[in-house]
Amino acid sequence: MKEWTREEKYRYLKDPQELVGLYDRIRGSRYRQTFHNQAVTGLMNDPNGFVWFDNRWHLFYQWCPWGAVHGLKHWYHIVSKDLVTWKNLGVCLLPDQEEGYDNKGVYSGSAMPIGDKIYLYYTGNHRDPDWIRHAYTCLARLGNDGWPEKYPLPLFGAHPDYTENQRDPKIICGVEEGTYYMLIGAETKEKHGCVLVYKSEDLQHGWHFEGELSVPGFEAFGNMWECPSIERIGGKDVLIFCPQHLSIPGRGGSQNHNGYIMGTMDWKTLTFTPDGQFHVLDFGFDSYAAACANNIEDADKAVLIAWMGVPDVSYPTDEEDWAGCLTLPRELTVRGRRLIQQPLPELKKLREEKVELRPNEFGACKLPEAAELELDCRAGHVRVHLFTDERGEGGLEIRYNDVKREITVDRSGLKTQFNLQEGTERTRPLENGLQHLRIFIDRSSVEIFVNDGDAVFTSRVFPQETEHHFRMEGDLFPRLWTLKPAVKEEFLI
């Protein structure tokens, strides 16, 4: 594994031609995705600034161009008309050099479309000459011409009553006429995660600190709360956030989680009253920093995209100097006291050819590199083995225990192992049993939707050349489609 110096990690991008050789090298990787957004070069992580504007979906992501390292972050810009096929527009926000408020990174944030502009709110990561970090909440404005204009001064700096871990501004409108709120992920001096609330009557000026969000029962729930958001979905308030350094049953050794709490938000008292426990958004191995779209034209359409990765983890493609992709977009609804995540109906447009299943002498079928597998599960125990060899052995296993009524995803059978410190299994109880699985398979990922979105398992996988079969056990009715590419592989900086 390459050891990066500080100078290498925080090198400024001066000319796109500096990246041509790296792009030419990584584009031939066997693990480059076909229908998922991924880093053009280097590393991508959090999705940012997800909005509907000018008849297109706009999405940005955290991008470090030089390699698979969390170094100097930029905002890279992509667009889509249907949330299925995507086009690269290139880098949008770059760090200012030397003394700028974001001189060591344009960190995560959100966006709000107003008139003919998109307002981009982000955390400016500033380092002084002694390498002490200072966080600033900054603003840029993007017009139809595609050129961003940064505001010369930040909206505000870090609040002194909290640690320097203050970032990920989420802009919220529609609470009160003519008023905007902003949520900031933060951490108390006692190292407890929290959310700070700011308010303004003007998107561009006059932001003032309202206070810390009260969430009764969650006063000491992990450390820093990253990527906070309060969404109104199906008439319910939902607090979505990423608590760090927290152990949760069924999550193996993972210490970083993405989840939500259902409840009621009172903006006057800054109190979010929970209506239950913390729920994990995605039970798989690799999902974090989920972002919901700001869509002021259709507030009832809640769409979520997340980073298909987790902090502090190395992936096999790190050796190729690239890492990271985004999940498929998911539509959010409420069922009872739970969020339901389902693949967007538009994703059916990716279906290319329905595959006739022809098991070989070992009961294994060929598994296309890009595919959708749908299974009706009629009764009893179920086992689905993906990415096996031609004998149906090894691979990633999905197993349902009908006695315990729980589903488990186990990737210990894959030949390429990584992140073993966080375990190789993830388990989720299913109160009503297993009825349905819908599985999206790309060259280096698998997304498993259980019972029409009651649970989701998202994981990176890196199958070797011999791991391109699958095998099923149980009373199942399967359908398999190949999927066509949805993201054009192109060098655009």
What do these predicted regions represent?
Residues 260-264, 465-493:
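Ligand-recognition surfaces built from glycine- and aromatic
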Residues 1-168, 173-221, 232-283, 297-301, ...:
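Beta-rich carbohydrate-recognition and catalytic domains
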Residues 353-413:
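Secretory/extracellular carbohydrate-interaction modules
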Residues 453-468:
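Short, solvent-exposed beta-strand-to-loop segments that form ligand-recognition rims
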Residues 277-280, 361-365, 424-430, 459:
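Beta-strand-rich interaction surfaces with strong enrichment in secreted/lumenal proteins
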Residues 373-375, 433-450:
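Short tryptophan-centered beta-strand motifs in secreted/extracellular beta-sheet-rich domains
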Residues 415-436:
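Short, aromatic/His-centered strand-loop micro-motif at the edge of beta-sheets
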